[in-house]
Amino acid sequence: SCLHCADAPCVTVCPTGASYKRSEDGIVLVNEDACIGCGLCAWACPYGARELDPRQGVMKKCTLCVDRIYNEALPEEDREPACVRTCPTGARHFGDLSDPASPVSRLVAERGGYDLMPELGTRPTNKYLPPRKKGAAEAGPLMPLVDVQATGLAGWLDRILGRF
């Protein structure tokens, strides 16, 4: 999915200006009326976030559900991207990273969130969170080892290799 980079190479490489970054919020979008489907943006994106829609002949990408996040007809709790709203494990989060007091900013700070491939200089706005450390109580008990005797070809191979 698109990382909505601050320095988005997909925007600068687009020959028609169809790929653009909104000044008000930094969301990177594609104007499908101006897109010629050349694929330069897909080539330039180091994250593989672009794909060609062969039927329409234009490039497609994540829009951050811009139609949802600003839709005042929706209840406040529904104004988030569909991927965040429907993630079955709650692994995705959404919010204002420019506000250090926002829940998502606090989460990134507490968990040590980081940029994907920072050496590329694209400055992605999406952050990745490292896995949570699990305590012994959370991890659950270990299953007992089962003594399995290999049979057939695996048994023969075990016997042969056991000689060395």
Which role does the model predict for each range below?
Residues 1-164:
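Non-ligating segments of multi-cofactor redox enzymes
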